[in-house]
């Protein structure tokens, strides 16, 4: 699939303004051609009837094309929640797995099994970043894989038996109108953000795993980027800079897990500074972000109460980037 980046470099100020105006209109038209409603399907907090767990999943839903981002931890959590919410995934053909961890990959096979009868193509194209299928092991040599599997290859094989096709992303790629995957994120600011204790083989040597297959989804709206991460192991700042390398636009909203729940005050301050400079207006942290961490960032930025939420099952961000249902109203 083709992908592109756009940069404007013109010497004459009038030409710059004209070109930027034309591009702005074009970018808006692309985004508005398939505006997405974002619904949280798995995270730590739930209302009556939903299932909360340590995981993440969200649906980017639009008239022309929709994309499922991550699939939760336990095999049936997201299935339970979509049935509870009345969300139909049978028309959704594309799935993004943010990284190999089981709390983001656990529901894929059950969801495919459930919705395939209604649509043979349902949830059949799965995007993963390069390195997703590398085998992880503990220091004791115990294998750890995606979902409930110890073997990454077995997980892949079981998915392919169900008609799932994996596409490995190596660089920023547009997978649906105005939806961009970062692919593996260069670690320029944050080196690694996440748990330790797993290893991968690099040239015959057991090397600490820093989850280079961590990728995020960017939605290029008329206002700027909406960035969604499953865990943000690559670092929020690093990820945001990849999106701004695709198109130099503000990062107006962040959604999902950013693994800041154990972050130091220094890291939170650095993150808040970057987000403020990037133009953040709306924040819906969930999963591993941490409520206290999110509140700290929101306070430093001075975000109004209506612009920060802690995601719950059924939380929604509307196509015009407003929170209409959340755990914190």
Question: Predicted regions: what is each one?
Answer:
Residues 31-33:
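Boundary at the C-terminal end of the N-terminal hydrophobic targeting segment
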Residues 36-85, 210, 214-229:
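Conserved beta-strand hairpin/beta-sheet module of binuclear metal-dependent hydrolase folds
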Residues 94, 101-107, 125, 207-314:
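Cap/insert and terminal regions of metallo-dependent hydrolase folds
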Residues 148-150, 173-222:
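Active-site-proximal loop/helix segment associated with metal-binding centers of metalloenzymes
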């Amino acid at each position: 699939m083709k992908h592109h980046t756009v940069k404007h470099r013109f010497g004459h100020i009038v030409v710059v303004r004209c070109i930027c105006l034309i591009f702005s209109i074009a970018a808006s038209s692309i985004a508005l051609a398939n505006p997405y409603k974002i619904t949280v399907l798995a995270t730590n907090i739930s209302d009556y009837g939903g299932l909360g767990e340590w995981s993440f999943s969200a649906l980017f839903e639009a008239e022309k094309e929709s994309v499922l981002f991550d699939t939760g931890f336990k095999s049936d959590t997201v299935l339970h929640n979509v049935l509870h919410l009345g969300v139909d995934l049978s028309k959704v053909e594309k799935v993004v797995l943010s990284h190999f961890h089981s709390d983001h990959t656990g529901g894929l096979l059950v969801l495919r099994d459930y919705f395939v009868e209604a649509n043979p193509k349902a949830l059949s194209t799965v995007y993963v970043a390069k390195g997703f299928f590398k085998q992880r092991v503990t220091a004791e040599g115990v294998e750890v894989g995606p979902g409930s599997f110890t073997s990454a290859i077995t997980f892949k094989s079981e998915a392919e038996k169900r008609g799932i096709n994996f596409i490995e992303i190596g660089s920023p790629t547009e997978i649906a109108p105005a939806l961009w995957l970062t692919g593996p994120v260069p670690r320029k600011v944050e080196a690694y953000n996440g748990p330790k204790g797993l290893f991968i083989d690099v040239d015959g040597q057991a090397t600490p795993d820093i989850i280079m297959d961590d990728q995020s989804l960017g939605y290029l709206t008329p206002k700027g980027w909406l960035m969604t991460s499953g865990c943000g192991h690559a670092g929020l700042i690093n990820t945001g800079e990849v999106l701004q390398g695709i198109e130099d636009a503000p990062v107006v909203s962040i959604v999902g897990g950013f693994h800041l729940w154990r972050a130091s005050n220094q890291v939170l301050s650095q993150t808040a500074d970057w987000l403020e400079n990037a133009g953040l207006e709306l924040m819906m942290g969930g999963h591993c972000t941490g409520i206290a961490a999110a509140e700290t960032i929101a306070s430093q930025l001075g975000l109004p109460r209506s612009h920060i939420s802690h995601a719950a099952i059924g939380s929604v961000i509307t196509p015009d980037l407003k929170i209409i249902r959340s755990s914190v109203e």
